Amino acid sequence: MDELCKEYNKEHPDINFHTNYDSSGTLMTQIKEGAKCNIFFSAGVEQMDELEKGYDGGSVEKDNRKDLLNNQVCLVTWKGSNTKVKSFKDMSKAKNMALADETVPVGQYTRKALINSGLVSGDKEKADDLKDTDISKVLGGLEINSCANVGAVAAAVAGGADEIGTVYYSDTFGYEDNLEIIEKLPNSLTGDVIYPVAPLKSDDISDAEFNASNEFIKFMSEEKAVKLFEKYHFSMS
């Protein structure tokens, strides 16, 4: 996003960006609790849907909401780990796993994959209720180390603290020397991994700010932006 903002500023130097990066669940909570935000760019549809219901003092402008990007969940290990895990269904062969918690989109997608693959029994619509203890039990006592966001998962596995973990394909960018992809999970297991974006409206957001937000969102689908997204392993939705 920093590169994208810099590219946009080349033609719009009057626009000032103040970016806040965290898990989509954390960002959603911050917005609902009153943090000012002009644009919400989420790694999960569920968090955007929740804000679209409305919150105290603001709302998602749903007519301008756009499903912008696609991603893919990957099972990874650290390079040189000599893990016995060769696929998602082999995860019980690992000693430990870094897993984003159930409020984080990549953690939610992973839990859906566990159910859809038959590794864990349950209702895929209630995948978010699947706790680490449940996962550990069905995977033969695999040690699950909960992470607050996908970046923490990538760092834990790349640093060798955990043998395996699930991250987005985009999160492997920059870790080529440290991470090895064991398997890219098919969407039939995870569901579509969609990144929606939308402008927000609230009492403290001016019409000028709202219009500027819409212009930037339009730019996010233009050729210069597409090339940047593809560089980081995203595809356009």
Placement of each model-derived feature along the sequence:
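Central helical "cap/lid" subdomain
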Residues: 55-66
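Exported/periplasmic ABC-transporter solute-binding proteins
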Residues: 1-12, 16, 25, 45, ...
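Short, glycine-/small- and polar/acidic-enriched structural segments
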Residues: 31, 65-68
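Active-site charged/polar residues at nucleotide-handling catalytic sites that mediate phosphoryl
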Residues: 34-35, 160
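Ligand-binding clamshell of periplasmic/extracellular solute-binding protein-like
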Residues: 19-29, 36-52
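CheY-like receiver
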Residues: 30-31, 156
